[in-house]
Amino acid sequence: MEEPLLHAILGLVLLLSTRTDASAARSKKGPIKEVVMDMAPHSFDDQYQGCIDLMEAELQELNRTEFANETFAEGWRSATEEWQRRWGRVSSPMVLRQDQAIAVLAYTMEGELYRVFNNATLTAGRSRQHYLSSYPFKTLHFLLSRALHTLQESQTQPCHNVFRGVRGTRFTAQQGTVVRFGQFTSSSLQKKVAEFFGLDTFFSVETCYGVPIKDLSTFPGEDEVLIPPFEQFRVTNSTYTAGRSFIQLRSQGKSSTYNCEFVKEKRCKERPCAFSADKSSPLPRSPWPGWAPLAAPHSH
């Protein structure tokens, strides 16, 4: 076997071995869950258009309140420690602010946070009141949304072809329909990596709002691209063979039901606030050139 090929195989084995605990949990045999893909109508899909500064002004108090959620508090503490280990002593210019980078780290770390967060995001939009009173991840949702927006603006490649493998859930989708994942959705630029995570459903996706987070991820070898809840896709192919689903998706822009909901509740009771709530937008224009990986934030 040629040496470069051997190194590539050993690298993939090393990558997969880093997730032994998570993969073991995900590989437990059980009944396959059947899910029909749609527009995820109960998703909380806020893009915070027109209220970024107002939302950031609320973060300190909001974050303190949400630390009562132990899953969030523990995930955030671990991610903060990892950020300090990687970039705490470096003073190079940054792409993301410290809190946005920590949010991405927290999402990619082992543990329950990403799973609990995603499940909550899928249903937090069942009503505005449910989001306001029962969704304990408002801070994380906002910071992740802003992180992806910032990275998307700074990359040179507007769209990416990625893969997503799912174990334990068999998704079905009608060809020609428009669907959303409705949560922050992990995918990989490497097909082999995606296959490792499952083959009960396998997605091939063109995303124009998902962005590579390799330089921010706890597991950079996964070549992860993180897709936001509000991106919508056309189903271009959907097949079912030997108990497995294959679904091909092409980006169709973005669509949101909600906009600036937390700020509206906090600041707009006396008089209506005017935000630019672009409910549906086309694909992005060419992004800004000169994307650079996260180096290190300045000290705050």
From Swiss-Prot:
Enzyme Commission number(s) of this protein: 2.4.2.31
Entry annotation: catalytic residues: 164, 186, 224
Specify where the region named Disordered lies, as residue ranges.
276-300
Q: Which GO terms describe its molecular function?
A: NAD+ poly-ADP-ribosyltransferase activity; NAD+-protein-arginine ADP-ribosyltransferase activity; nucleotidyltransferase activity
**Does the keyword Transmembrane helix feature in the UniProt annotation?**
no
SS bonds (residue pairs): 51-260, 159-208
Give the similarity note. Answer: Belongs to the Arg-specific ADP-ribosyltransferase family.
Protein name (record):
Erythroblast NAD(P)(+)--arginine ADP-ribosyltransferase
